[in-house]
Amino acid sequence: MIWRDKSYLPEEMSFSVNYLGAEVTQVGLNFSRPAAQVLGQYYNFIRLGWEGYHDIQNNSMEIARYCHERIGAMACFENYSKDVVNPLFVWSLNEEYERTAKWTLYDLQAALQQSGWMVPAYSLPKDIEDITVMRIVVRQGMSRDMADMLLKDIANAVAEFEKLQYPTQSRLQWEAQEKQHGKVFTH
């Protein structure tokens, strides 16, 4: 469908979300999807076979569980869920830690981005937007060595943040209850 301009677009068809550091608005018809992803998955399934595809997914899950466990063991973080059922997981700052921290997850996002990692920090949807989380999606090709490098970069960033004498700008915004966005990722 094509609309002459934005004013003709029914507001009910658009959905906005704070994603990867920017407000993203998406328009779509319910239950409509492009076929390219389905074709790509079909190709991979034919090329790799069930066992190959299964091995890739098992590796992704293993790495996700490992990262989930290690991040959850850090005193400043709290995992959103106890189990990892997909190769992704979400965590936030531990409530007690957050009360006295001089930094926010937006600062951690920026620090990780300087090390080459794209780990988004974002607020949750309406009615719980005061909660900020970070998310890791473990994709095909992420190795245990890469996971260890990411975990080391997270630990190093937290260690640097804990040396701060004064709060960061994002922490001051958090205290003032101002809406925040992480730095926008460019691909």
Residue ranges and their predicted role:
Residues 1-86, 92-97:
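Active-site C-terminal subdomain of aminotransferase-like
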Residues 77, 122-126:
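Short, solvent-exposed loop/turn elements at beta->coil junctions and helix N-caps
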Residues 12-14, 100, 147-149:
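Short conserved micro-motifs at the rims of enzyme active sites and ligand-binding pockets
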